[in-house]
Amino acid sequence: MIAGSQGSGKSTLSIQIKKYFKKFYFKSVVILSIDDFYLSTNQRKQLAKKLKTNLFDTRGVPCTHNLKLLIETVDKLKRNNFPVYIPIFDKVTDNKKKHNRKINKADLIILEGWCVGSKPINPEYLKKNINDLEKINDPKMIWRTAYNQALVEYQKLFNKFNYYIFIKLPNWQYVINWKYKQELGLRSLRRDNHLKKKLFLFIQYYEKLSKWMSLTSPDICNVLITLDKNQKTKKILYK
């Protein structure tokens, strides 16, 4: 498993590992991005209605993935039950693409994603409002309590993997700039101030769990990669 906040380079690292094992060990590596298993826009709206908070309209936190499908996909890959079809999520349209990715072989499986490997948040930290989104839109803690309870079920997925790499950022303030840079690339844009404002609001959905992981994941991961302010590797700690 590989985890890290937005813009930390977890997808790039996954690809590098895949190339390494193919070149030197002739192994077929399958990369599963937890992002590809997001629920559709309509499914999230139904979830928001069911849980009585429109915060679940926005993809991101646990609850907004098709966890059942993701676990089934991992199990099929492990059992060599090929071909295995993996969904592809389009973040621009905020929905799954019509076509899937077909996998015929898997010697190694990498699961990468921003919340991968996270343990549930403790009650004290969960209760604390760390941004305006929580303070204004989740005063009764309906949203954060629901996704934190869902995170308990996510442990069934995480426990299927035996190696955990965590990428730690120097500070949360860098996330918005790195995410902005990433999104400009996806949209082939040079600059978009409106997009930056939207991203500032968007990353608040990820802030609590990301900060919680920065506090807890360094103690449970197998490899800790610390980045500097320029997105460069500052330190690698093997455990």
Residues of each region from the PLM?
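Conserved lysine of the Walker
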Residues: 10
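Loop/turn-to-beta-strand initiation segments
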Residues: 82-84, 105-109, 163
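Walker A (P-loop) phosphate-binding loop of P-loop NTPases
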Residues: 7
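Hydrophobic positions on the alpha1 helix immediately C-terminal to the Walker A/P-loop
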Residues: 13, 17
